[in-house]
């Protein structure tokens, strides 16, 4: 039965801007990194190109994209008041919420993959138009982006939880934007590895302990948040 709910959620994406967002966000990062590289007066160090892109993605574009994505997915139901019918169906509540969570995580993975592909296309383009040093390490970049995706699961679930809980789009926007800017301000803080919006950023840390803490809390914590969201939302009335 769950696969039917997931399929319905995927079909609903055609009516929203979610797919456009998932294409535009990684593309913006890849384009910006390419423009910055071509604007250099010195040779481009290809070994750090992927790290620069991953940092820009983890610090700002990914958390803001997750915020917007959670709002878009929730407003597909809140806007036309679809909850009033869907949530009255027997056993529908946990399945609907779980399907939305799975689709959102799938879209996050798709954005990570698209960014990886675009960076692999940008690297030879930069090398053909500008002097470069070193080589683009596709394997390292892919691994970093994959770990960032796992570490971002907790933020995804928190954002989706708030977006589904409130009919207004303001609370999830405040949470996402506030969390992103708080992460930027607390980047060098000792407790940064425990802050959800910094967990993906910590995949760039030289300290392996910080990376391990962030990916463990981000991944496992995301599953715990998902379970808590399903229990909470399944026991309450349609979002007010």
Where are the predicted features?
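Aromatic- and glycine-rich beta-strand/loop motifs that create alpha-glucan
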Residues: 1-23
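Hydrophobic alpha-helical transmembrane segments of multi-pass membrane transport/permease proteins
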Residues: 15-39, 55-69, 173-187
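Short loop-to-helix capping motifs
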Residues: 15-17, 92, 167-169
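Secretory targeting signals
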Residues: 30-66, 70, 98-166, 207-209, ...
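Terminal transmembrane helical anchor/hairpin motif
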Residues: 32-52, 173-240
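Transmembrane helix boundary and interhelical loop/hinge segments in multi-pass membrane proteins
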Residues: 68-85
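Transmembrane helix-loop junction
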Residues: 76, 89, 124, 128, ...
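Short helix-to-coil transition segments within interhelical loops
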Residues: 87-93
């Amino acid at each position: 039965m769950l696969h039917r709910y997931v399929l319905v959620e995927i079909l609903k994406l055609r009516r929203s801007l979610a797919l456009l967002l998932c294409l535009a966000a990684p593309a913006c990062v890849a384009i910006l990194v390419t423009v910055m590289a071509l604007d250099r007066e010195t040779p481009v160090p290809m070994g750090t190109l992927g790290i620069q892109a991953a940092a820009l993605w983890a610090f700002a574009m990914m958390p803001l994209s997750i915020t917007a994505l959670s709002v878009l997915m929730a407003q597909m139901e809140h806007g036309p008041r679809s909850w009033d019918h869907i949530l009255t169906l027997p056993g529908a509540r946990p399945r609907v919420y779980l399907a939305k969570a799975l689709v959102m995580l799938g879209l996050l993975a798709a954005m990570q993959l698209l960014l990886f592909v675009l960076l692999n296309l940008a690297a030879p383009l930069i090398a053909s138009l500008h002097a470069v040093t070193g080589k683009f390490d596709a394997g390292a970049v892919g691994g970093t982006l994959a770990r960032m995706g796992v570490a971002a699961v907790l933020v995804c679930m928190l954002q989706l939880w708030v977006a589904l809980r409130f009919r207004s789009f303001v609370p999830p926007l405040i949470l996402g934007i506030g969390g992103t800017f708080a992460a930027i301000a607390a980047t060098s803080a000792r407790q940064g590895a425990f802050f959800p919006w910094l967990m993906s950023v910590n995949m760039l840390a030289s300290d392996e302990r910080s990376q391990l803490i962030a990916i463990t809390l981000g991944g496992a914590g995301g599953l715990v948040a998902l379970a808590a969201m399903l229990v909470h939302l399944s026991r309450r009335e349609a979002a007010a």
